[in-house]
A protein has these predicted regions:
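AlphaC helix of the eukaryotic protein kinase fold
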Residues: 93-115
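Activation-segment/catalytic-loop signature of the eukaryotic protein kinase fold
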Residues: 128
Length: 199
């Protein structure tokens, strides 16, 4: 009897893609693109109530990215700022100054991404808001592996070196991507080109 209940529950969980997801409400959502007044309500509904899968969370420099789905089942990436904790500081002023600095850097990252959104090779940006009082960016979810995770599969020796052909192809594709950045108005400098940020 108990075995049947466990089996039925397991089957139910396997079929329900929403099980194990955390509700992430994006407050103060600002769309990344200009929208007409008739388009705004649907856009807000699309990106302000998300279901985040914390099992997919990956941490970067000052943020963490989690795969989330909206009510329509569309996958998006929810990137949240990682704020410094209070216990790392002796005084409140130093802590608050660092929090302000982190928030400004995260907003600058959003604005830079906004300039590149829509260019081939860059994830589409949907908007900015806060989740639980923490700044957040909603963008296109890109399925795949980072170069940092894949490079061992492409290695030709124990030192992790790539074959000249693979290295040349990666270099060519990265160069092509960097050239597209010149299409942005006054130019653009990417400050975090690394294998962890290349998919």
């Amino acid at each position: 009897m108990m075995t049947d209940l466990v089996s039925a529950t397991s089957q139910s969980l396997a079929r329900d893609p929403m099980v194990g997801l955390r509700l992430a409400r994006v407050d103060g959502f600002e769309p990344a693109v200009a929208l007409g007044t008739d388009e705004l309500p649907a856009y807000l509904r699309r990106f302000t109530m998300l279901f985040a899968d914390d099992a997919t969370m990956r941490r970067g420099g000052i943020g963490r990215v989690t795969r989330a789905v909206n009510a329509q089942g569309e996958a998006v990436a929810l990137k949240q700022l990682i704020l410094p904790t209070r216990d790392e500081f002796d005084d409140d002023a130093a802590h608050e100054a660092l929090v302000t600095k982190f928030k400004a850097a995260f907003r600058e990252e959003y604005e830079c991404h906004r300039a590149l959104s829509g260019l081939k090779g860059f994830p589409r940006l949907y908007g900015w808001g806060e989740v639980g009082g923490v700044p957040a960016i909603v963008m296109e979810w890109v399925e795949g592996e980072t170069l940092a995770r894949l490079r061992s599969r492409f290695a030709v020796d124990d030192a992790g070196r790539l074959s000249p052909l693979v290295a040349a192809r990666l270099g060519r594709d990265l160069f092509d991507l960097l050239c597209r950045m010149s299409l942005v108005g006054e130019g653009f400098v990417h400050r975090d080109i690394s294998p962890a940020n290349i998919m």
